[in-house]
């Protein structure tokens, strides 16, 4: 595959709620672009992008997969992402490095919870998007109702570029509002054959109405196009497409297309829209460099434009360990890099040498000798590069804008079934945690148990299954536990003196530290305010280390302590007896004493819960959620069903699905995702502390 110009590259993601048809759509794209010669199906377990054993067994996407295809002289790099909330890290890191996205919306249900979550992530990274309303062949599918949910739930200007012809099993094709024609798919040949014809008479009036809306909305972003429209009463197709592309990239509106990927209708025009409306790397202003410490994240900063004749820069966004070694997926933002070259990991401050470079096609790979700005490739040979690290030329050692990762909310204890497997289990878990930034691994300092923290029960179940399959380690697993955290609610200044004398050289260190609460998700922040050398510079990192190590075990119930700032403002040292170890010990002890006086609190994860229930069970569902300490947010009726939205502590949601099925005779369903951490009520805190004592 030859290297196209930057203007002819599209880096896109395909994302949606689980079961909306992401992988099915990707399979059709690969078939119509000639990459694959047969169409894989999720239910048959033979799709290209769902290549892990667990994905094929369960019929769900677990890890994002990168594939490359060509369409009309353009290269499209596609990442197919998971739809289940437990694997949201894959969507997060993919959207971070992509230039555009296709959001697939189910034609029956419309916008669903995970679509909303992914949409907010795309908003965070300013990713241009087109929307594909899928599954219009299904019983109950309604393009116009699904379209209304785009405006209601996503609060966007949704702009139809197509209208459906027929509905449910009579869905035949689409009205193309840009070129004002009908596109009809013929039977056979897996949807590869279709033809244009005049718009059906019964749709002519509606098509004219929607065409006028398209012109009014799209041309408003392009003064020259609007002027042409006023002069001639219409615009040519190229002018209209140019205006749609501009409005798509700047987010003024979101183009909407439709079809049914499973029945092979609508995918080729979707591919055309990727070429016509989603940006090439050169259409975007370039990625921002990271904010300096203390700098406002929203401030204007230098951007790295997509150019091949510039110093190399790239972002590592995914790590995979397989039988061949470690693969590091990198989005290249500028420059050229060849196998054998050396680059700087500017995040960590060390050199890396590039071994081999691969273009990935799901789990298959093709070796290439070099990568250019705009490419997505996998590197072999990197020793210490993790997700979110920047790789850059030594001529311009930039650090690119960092990635944000979700907070794990569920803990399990893990131990191997045999003592001989301890080392193998630890190595396996470390490698899996290196691949997945939403997975945390720690050792309980009191019990010595290995604690694994993840996004949900399915997430952790998959990790343990991978440990067994890939590392040949069977484990005993503790019952899932809520991943509580601790924090403080007020400022406090603590002085601690560590003094130990028992013959020979002793230990001495004194620290004076201010502990202050921070907002949620701000982590742990250290500031050195020592003046006059009361604590020598070489000992200050030891104080920082001591606090951070001790913060893993909070003062109330032993949970990790988060969201606080500690400032070293003074201290004392001894010329002979002071050492880094003495100051680390002093930092740990100062934390233990100071935190007790800073209003310590236990935090619990609060989940966004959505329950879809028949009308006659609403009272039971709402009453039950209230008993679970839930806060009802709102209720939406749709025909005979009601959607109940609530925020409920995760602690109260274990075993909920069985109870919900029993309460509604199996007719209700629910989804749940993490929203925020909140202090627990006093009675719950007492219960937690009693259990941990």
UniProtKB/Swiss-Prot annotation:
Biological processes per GO annotation: ribosome disassembly
GO CC list: cytoplasm
GO molecular function: GTP binding; GTPase activity; guanosine tetraphosphate binding; translation elongation factor activity
Gene3D superfamilies in the record: 3.30.230.10, 3.30.70.240, Elongation Factor G (Translational Gtpase), domain 3 (3.30.70.870), P-loop containing nucleotide triphosphate hydrolases (3.40.50.300), Translation factors (2.40.30.10)
Domain tr-type G per the UniProt entry, residue ranges: 7-282
Record keywords, A-Z: Cytoplasm, Elongation factor, GTP-binding, Nucleotide-binding, Protein biosynthesis
Compartments, as annotated in UniProt: Cytoplasm
InterPro entries xref list: EFG_II, EFG_III, EFG_III/V, EFG_IV, EFG_V, EFG_V-like, EFTu-like_2, G_TR_CS
CDD domains: EF-G, EFG_III, EFG_mtEFG1_IV, EFG_mtEFG_C, EFG_mtEFG_II
N-terminal signal peptide: none
One Pfam family named in its UniProt record: GTP_EFTU_D2
Main location as per UniProt: cytoplasm
Binding site residues for GTP: 16-23, 80-84, 134-137
Matching HAMAP family: EF_G_EF_2_B (MF_00054_B)
Function: Catalyzes the GTP-dependent ribosomal translocation step during translation elongation. During this step, the ribosome changes from the pre-translocational (PRE) to the post-translocational (POST) state as the newly formed A-site-bound peptidyl-tRNA and P-site-bound deacylated tRNA move to the P and E sites, respectively. Catalyzes the coordinated movement of the two tRNA molecules, the mRNA and conformational changes in the ribosome.
Annotated family: Belongs to the TRAFAC class translation factor GTPase superfamily. Classic translation factor GTPase family. EF-G/EF-2 subfamily.
Protein name as annotated: Elongation factor G
Species: Granulibacter bethesdensis (strain ATCC BAA-1260 / CGDNIH1)
Gene expressing this chain: fusA
């Amino acid at each position: 595959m030859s290297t196209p110009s930057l203007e002819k590259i599209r880096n896109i993601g395909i994302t949606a709620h689980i079961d909306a048809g992401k992988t099915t759509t990707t399979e059709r794209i690969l078939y119509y672009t000639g990459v694959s010669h047969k169409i894989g199906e999720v239910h048959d377990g033979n799709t290209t992008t769902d290549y892990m054993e667990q994905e094929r067994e369960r019929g769900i996407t677990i890890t994002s997969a990168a594939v490359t295809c060509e369409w009309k002289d353009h290269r499209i790099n596609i990442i197919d992402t998971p739809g289940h909330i437990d694997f949201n890290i894959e969507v997060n890191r993919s959207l971070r490095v992509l230039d555009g996205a296709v959001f697939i919306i189910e034609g029956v249900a419309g916008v669903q919870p995970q679509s909303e979550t992914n949409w907010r992530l795309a908003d965070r990274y300013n990713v241009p998007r087109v929307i594909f309303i899928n599954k219009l062949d299904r019983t109950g599918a309604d393009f116009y109702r699904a379209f209304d949910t785009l405006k209601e739930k996503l609060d966007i200007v949704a702009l139809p570029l197509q209208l459906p012809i027929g509905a449910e099993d009579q869905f035949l094709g689409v009205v193309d509002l840009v070129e004002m024609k009908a596109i009809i798919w013929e039977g056979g040949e897996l949807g590869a054959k279709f033809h244009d014809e005049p718009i059906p008479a019964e749709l002519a009036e509606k098509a004219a109405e929607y065409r006028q809306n398209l012109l009014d909305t799209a041309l408003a972003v392009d003064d020259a196009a609007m002027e042409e429209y006023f002069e001639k009463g219409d615009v040519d197709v190229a002018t209209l497409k140019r205006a749609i592309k501009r409005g798509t990239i700047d987010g003024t509106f979101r183009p909407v297309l439709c079809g049914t990927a499973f029945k092979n209708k609508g995918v080729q025009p979707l591919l055309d829209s990727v070429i016509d409306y989603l940006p090439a790397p050169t259409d975007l202003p370039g990625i921002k460099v990271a904010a300096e410490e203390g700098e406002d994240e929203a401030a204007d900063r230098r951007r790295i434009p997509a150019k091949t004749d510039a110093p190399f820069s790239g972002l590592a966004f995914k790590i995979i360990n397989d039988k061949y070694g470690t693969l590091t997926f990198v989005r290249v933002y500028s420059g050229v890099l060849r196998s054998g070259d050396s680059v700087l990991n500017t995040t960590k401050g060390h050199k890396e040498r590039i071994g081999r470079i691969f273009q990935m096609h799901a789990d298959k790979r093709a070796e290439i000798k070099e990568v250019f700005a705009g490419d997505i490739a996998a590197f072999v040979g990197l020793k210490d590069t993790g997700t979110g690290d920047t790789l850059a030329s030594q001529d311009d050692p930039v650090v690119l804008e960092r990635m944000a990762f979700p907070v794990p909310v569920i803990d399990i204890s893990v131990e191997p079934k045999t003592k001989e497997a301890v080392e193998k289990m630890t190595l396996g878990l470390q490698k899996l945690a290196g691949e997945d930034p939403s997975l945390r691994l720690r050792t309980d300092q009191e019990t010595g148990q290995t604690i694994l923290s993840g996004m949900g029960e399915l997430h952790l179940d998959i990790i343990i299954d991978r440990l067994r399959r890939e590392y040949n380690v069977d484990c005993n697993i503790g019952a899932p536990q809520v991943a509580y955290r601790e924090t403080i609610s007020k400022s406090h200044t603590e002085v601690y003196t560590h003094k130990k004398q028992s013959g020979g050289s002793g230990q001495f260190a004194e620290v004076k530290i201010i502990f202050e609460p921070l907002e949620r998700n701000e982590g742990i922040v250290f500031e050195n305010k020592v003046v006059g050398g009361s604590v020598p510079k070489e000992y200050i990192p030891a104080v920082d280390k001591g606090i951070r190590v001790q913060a893993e075990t909070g003062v109330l119930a032993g949970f990790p302590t988060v969201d606080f700032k500690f400032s070293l403002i003074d201290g004392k040292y001894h010329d002979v007896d002071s050492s880094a170890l003495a100051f680390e010990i002093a930092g740990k002890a100062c934390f233990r004493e100071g935190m007790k006086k800073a209003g310590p609190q236990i935090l619990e994860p609060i989940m966004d819960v959505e329950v879809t229930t028949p009308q006659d069970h609403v009272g039971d569902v709402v009453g039950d959620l209230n008993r679970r300490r839930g806060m009802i947010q709102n209720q939406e009726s749709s025909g005979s069903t009601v959607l109940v939205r609530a925020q409920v502590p995760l602690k109260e949601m274990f075993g909920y699905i069985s109870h919900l099925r029993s309460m509604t005779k199996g007719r209700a369903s629910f989804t749940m995702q993490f929203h925020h951490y909140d202090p627990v009520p006093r009675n719950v805190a007492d219960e937690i502390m009693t259990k941990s004592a």
